[in-house]
Amino acid sequence: MLDQSQVQKIAHLARLEITPEEESQFASQLSSILDYFDQLNELPTEGVEPTTRAIELSNIVRGDRQISWDGDNAATTRQALLDNAPEPEGDFFRVPRIMGGDEA
């Protein structure tokens, strides 16, 4: 079981102000946690590789695919994109001016 000086040191390191009643409560709780870690230390871990995760993580992303602007569907695709633009201007997207100059 942790004594009060150890609990006070832990509280100081954690920048906590605790009352004497809390000291005895935390001493009991922290001792239980440390006892649990002692139990974990008894597990047979020989041959177990150290790891940071239980399973491997990897990014799952869709594969890139090239869209051809040439060919039969080029005009249809281009027009569909322009039809969804807020302010199309001919075959271009009209966007707000971000640099200085006269307003168009």
UniProtKB/Swiss-Prot annotation:
E.C. numbers: 6.3.5.-
EC category: ligase
Superkingdom of source: Bacteria
Signal peptide (from-to): none
Gene Ontology BP terms: glutaminyl-tRNAGln biosynthesis via transamidation; regulation of translational fidelity; translation
Keyword Transmembrane among record annotations: no
Lineage: Bacteria, Bacillati, Cyanobacteriota, Cyanophyceae, Synechococcales
Pfam family, one: GatC
Coiled-coil spans in chain: none
Task performed by this protein: Allows the formation of correctly charged Asn-tRNA(Asn) or Gln-tRNA(Gln) through the transamidation of misacylated Asp-tRNA(Asn) or Glu-tRNA(Gln) in organisms which lack either or both of asparaginyl-tRNA or glutaminyl-tRNA synthetases. The reaction takes place in the presence of glutamine and ATP through an activated phospho-Asp-tRNA(Asn) or phospho-Glu-tRNA(Gln).
Known partners and oligomeric status: Heterotrimer of A, B and C subunits.
Protein family according to the UniProt entry: Belongs to the GatC family.
Keyword vocabulary terms for this entry: ATP-binding, Ligase, Nucleotide-binding, Protein biosynthesis
Segments for region (Disordered): 85-104
Residues that span the membrane, as ranges: none
GO molecular function: asparaginyl-tRNA synthase (glutamine-hydrolyzing) activity; ATP binding; glutaminyl-tRNA synthase (glutamine-hydrolyzing) activity
Catalytic activity, as annotated: L-glutamyl-tRNA(Gln) + L-glutamine + ATP + H2O = L-glutaminyl-tRNA(Gln) + L-glutamate + ADP + phosphate + H(+); L-aspartyl-tRNA(Asn) + L-glutamine + ATP + H2O = L-asparaginyl-tRNA(Asn) + L-glutamate + ADP + phosphate + 2 H(+)
Protein name (database record): Glutamyl-tRNA(Gln) amidotransferase subunit C
